[in-house]
């Protein structure tokens, strides 16, 4: 996080500099690999977990590769957030059934987590433009200033590519923000998030009936309505 305005949060990059922040992140990944090797009962499970982390990093690198790219498509965006956020949720959701050797449940849980993660990230990007800095606890427009064009920006570009591109190139970010707020970009972004939430809920409905299924469904629905 290069942005320095997160409220009430200590940040490694701000307190110790970018080099230590990067090395600290690398160290944490090594620690994760070590813990997985100690607790994974089968090599296949360890391989799947490492594959998820590989895809997670690939999503982050994909996003970096599209910095300041006004030709980025929604498909590019979905591919990147599927790695950087969707994969994290998918891995978290599928670890328990993976250990229990329930292949059918593992695959379903993975898909549920992926859809929830994608919806979560889209909503995060939606709130960057639909909320205020005070509500979010962090500066708005931080991503677009860093060349990260999320769903609201991409929908705005679809609506008026010439105008929005020109505003971005001239760093008139407040005007981009105003355009997004008055266009259909936010409505389309929310609809996109909802589509992934509904996909997750359809898969959740196929889980064994009971209190746990209802709880998972309730949490999934609430994520779509969050304001933070």
Which residue ranges define each predicted feature?
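Single conserved hydrophobic/aromatic residue that forms the stacking wall/gate
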Residues: 1-8, 12-13
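Mobile late-domain/C-terminal helix-loop "cap" segments
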Residues: 163-207
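Short, solvent-exposed positions on alpha-helices
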Residues: 43-47, 104-107, 187, 191, ...
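A beta-strand-loop signature enriched in Asp, Gly, Thr, and Trp
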Residues: 127-147, 163, 167
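Alpha-helical phosphate/pyrophosphate-handling elements in metalloenzyme active cores
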Residues: 35, 75-116, 152-157, 197-228
């Amino acid at each position: 996080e290069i942005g320095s305005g997160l409220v009430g949060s200590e940040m490694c990059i701000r307190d110790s500099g970018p080099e230590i922040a990067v090395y600290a992140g690398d160290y944490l990944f090594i620690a994760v690999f070590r813990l997985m090797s100690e607790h994974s009962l089968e090599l296949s499970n360890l391989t799947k977990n490492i594959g998820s982390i590989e895809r997670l990093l690939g999503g982050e690198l994909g996003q970096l590769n599209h910095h300041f790219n006004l030709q980025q498509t929604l498909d590019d965006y979905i591919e990147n957030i599927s790695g950087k956020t969707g994969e994290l949720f998918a891995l978290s959701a599928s670890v328990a059934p993976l250990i229990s050797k329930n292949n059918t449940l593992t695959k379903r849980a993975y898909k549920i987590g992926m859809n929830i993660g994608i919806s979560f990230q889209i909503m995060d990007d939606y709130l960057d433009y639909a909320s205020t800095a005070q509500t979010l606890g962090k500066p708005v427009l931080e991503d677009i200033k860093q060349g990260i064009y999320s769903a609201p920006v991409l929908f705005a570009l679809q609506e008026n590519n010439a105008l929005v591109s020109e505003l971005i190139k001239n760093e008139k970010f407040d005007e981009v923000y105003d355009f997004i707020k008055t266009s259909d970009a936010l409505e389309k972004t929310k609809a996109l998030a909802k589509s992934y939430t509904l996909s997750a809920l359809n898969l959740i409905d196929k889980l064994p009936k009971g209190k746990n299924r209802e709880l998972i469904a309730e949490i999934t629905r609430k994520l779509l309505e969050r304001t933070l």
